[in-house]
């Protein structure tokens, strides 16, 4: 009888969720993305979405198949995502200004909320997501033997 591989269920579940995330990056592929204080569409947005979709598919495959490069990709993607979110936090005022200028119900609802509260919620949510990423990277580190069982 073989011993169960620790982390297999968690990593395989994460693999499926990363592939789903890759699909959501592509709908629509040119949706504007916040980079350095501006909302960028067109070719910049397409590259951004394809880059993240590629990372997420790679994570899905690497985690599902327990490849050693999957572990490396978890760490690399955590670093890239962290840098991306930090630039978003640095330029969050510009991003929120863009959100507030949107026509329709979203812009109206956001305009009715105190801007300081919006900034606080935006910052807290971004930091919480980063903590989740780093928590997953730490879990991968603690279960790194999973990636050597191929």
Mark where each language-model region is.
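Topology signature of small-to-medium multi-pass alpha-helical membrane proteins
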Residues: 1-150
């Amino acid at each position: 009888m073989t011993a169960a591989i620790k982390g297999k269920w968690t990593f395989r579940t994460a693999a499926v969720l990363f592939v789903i995330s890759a699909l959501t990056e592509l709908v629509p592929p040119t949706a504007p993305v916040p980079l350095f204080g501006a909302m960028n569409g067109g070719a910049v947005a397409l590259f951004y979405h394809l880059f993240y979709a590629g990372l997420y598919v790679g994570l899905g495959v690497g985690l599902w198949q327990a490849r050693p490069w999957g572990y490396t990709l978890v760490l690399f993607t955590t670093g890239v995502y962290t840098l991306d979110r930090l630039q978003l936090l640095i330029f969050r005022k510009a991003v929120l200004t863009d959100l507030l200028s949107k026509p329709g119900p979203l812009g109206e609802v956001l305009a009715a909320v105190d801007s300081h509260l919006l900034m606080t919620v935006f910052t807290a949510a971004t930091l919480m997501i980063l903590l989740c990423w780093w928590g997953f990277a730490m879990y991968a580190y603690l279960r790194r033997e999973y990636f050597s069982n191929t």
